[in-house]
Design a protein with these regions (language model features):
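Conserved beta-strand segments of alpha/beta enzyme cores
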Residues: 4-5, 76, 101
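Rossmann-fold NAD(P)-binding glycine/threonine-rich loop
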Residues: 57-74, 86-93
Length: 137
């Protein structure tokens, strides 16, 4: 099992690309893994009628929806927070391929000594800090 397509939301017109890929219907399944209010809303707006949105990204700020889409489109929205070891291995292989824009996913790199202060800043500004990478040498 795997994704048939991946769409770069920064480099592509998401709506146009999804319409092209799906002959105008929208994707049957969208996996929201970023945790941004924008990508959560995009997932609900772009998924096909009777489609499924899988939410694994953790939004750090409130996300607002027009709930009429849930009913009108008969959506199946699911959340998941658990992963198996094989899932982590798959993510590592994906990152090793170099196709993921990692620099856009990480707000800051810190040493273990700097981590407590960085986490405090993240806690105080959840909408401004996306991910913090603690680099061990």
């Amino acid at each position: 099992m795997g994704a048939s397509y991946a769409v770069n939301t920064i480099a592509e017109d998401v709506h146009a690309r999804l319409q092209e890929i799906t002959a105008g219907f929208g994707p049957d399944v969208i996996i929201e893994a970023v945790g941004s209010p924008v990508t959560y809303q995009m997932a609900v707006n772009e998924v096909a009628f009777t489609g499924r949105v899988i939410c694994i990204g953790y939004a750090k700020t409130e996300v607002s929806f027009q709930t009429k889409f849930f009913v009108q489109k008969e959506l199946d929205i699911r959340g998941s927070r658990n992963a198996q070891p094989s899932d982590f291995r798959a993510v590592i292989r994906y990152l090793e391929r170099g196709t993921c824009p990692v620099d856009r996913l990480i707000s800051r790199e810190v040493t273990p000594e700097e981590a407590p202060q960085a986490m405090q800043q993240w806690s105080e500004n959840p909408g401004k800090v996306f991910r913090i990478l603690v680099r061990f040498n």
